[in-house]
Amino acid sequence: MNDTIILVSEETLKDDTGQRYKSEVQTDELLCELGSITRSEWSQANQAGYEAEYEVELFFLDYAGQRTAIFHGKRYAIYRTYRRGERIELYLGTRVGEIDAE
């Protein structure tokens, strides 16, 4: 594994007044391996409203269902996963029409 990724999840917390709010929780940098997006994957992602950007593979035990990742300094949606034994493939993309605010 020759690259790193940060996985992001949300948790709902309560403040002192009992109001609920969402807070982001980021993992430490995790080792991953960069794969490639096939033409078929790109097409399927596009039909689902995503622009496919990357496929990364990491150890299955490092993944806990997060829906967002930070890869090479940019935030991506995890729009699909595929388990391969002890590893899992995460497919990263952006929503079609979404403007990057970073």
Regions found by a protein language model. Name each.
Residues Q19-E102:
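Short, conserved turn/kink motifs that form compact alpha/beta structural patches or helix kinks used as
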